[in-house]
Amino acid sequence: MNDNELDNYIEAGRIAKTVLHKCAAEIKPGVGLAEIFEMVLDEISAAGVSHSFPPNISLNNCAAHDTASPDEERIFAEGDLVKLDIGTHIDGYIADTAVTVDLGDHASLCEASRAALDAAINVVAPEVVVSEIGAVVEETITSFGYKPIINLTGHALGRYSLHHGLSIPNTGKFGSAVLREDMVIAIEPFASTGSGLVHEAARAEIYQVIGNAPVRSPAGRKIMKKAEEMHGLPFARRWLNVPRAELALPALLRQGNLFLYHCLSDVPESFVSQFEHTIIVTADGALVTTR
C-alpha cells in the first residue's frame, strides 16, 4: 500500500467516524428515519468525500440492509434498537463503520457486540486465520448470554469494492483464509437475543450493479447510468428520480444487471446489536481507521 492509498483510507475513516457519531446522537424517539438518512448524506458531502453505500438504518430484529424508502415515514420509538451503518470513500478507498443506538433497555446486548469488536481487533495481525477472529467474537458474545449471528460476516475492502473476497466470520466454526499485511478489513460482530441466524425479509431498498446485459427500456438505461455513477457501489431506490422505475427495476434484476439486497432479520420480537470498524492489517497488528 502506497502513502496516497494509506492517507485516503485514514482520512475516509476519520470522516466516517465523525459523521457516524454526530448522526447517531440525533437518533431519538420521535425523529424520522429519513431525517437521519439525509443527515448522514449531507454530512458526508459537507466533508468533501463520497458515500460508499446508502446509510443502513436497521431496527430491532433487522440486523442489516434496511434503509429509507422513497416514501419513508417510519419514526423512531421508545424501546427501539437502531443500527446505523455508514460508509465513506475517497477515490474509492473505503471506510465502513457502524454503531447501535439503544432507545430502550438493551445496554448489555450493545456491550456484547462492542466488546466483541474490541476483542477481535486485538487479534488482528498478519498470518492470523480468520476463524481465530470469529472464535473471539463468538466467545465474547456468548459470555454475555447472547448469540452471534453466524450467517453474517465482516469482509475485506478493496478500491470501490465493499466485499472484496475475504469474509471475517462471527464464529470460530469456519473460515480458513489468512490475513496478510496491507489487507483492509471491516469487522462487524452482531449479537442477538434470537436464533443467531438471519433470513431475507420482504423489505428491500438497496441495489447494486452486477451485470451489463443490453437494456432496451429508456427507464432501465437511466437507472443503469445512475448506478454506474456509483462506480459499482450499492445505491438506494430512494435516489432514483426515474419515471417508470418500478417497472424497470424488476426487469434489470431478471436480466442479471442488478442485485437486490433484502433486509436481513432474526426471528420476530428479537433484538440485534452491531458495532463495526475498518482496519488495516499492519506489520505490528491493526490500524483502525474509524476509531
Can you say where each PLM-predicted feature lies in the sequence?
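Active-site neighborhoods and metal-handling regions in enzymes and metal-associated proteins
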Residues: 1-291
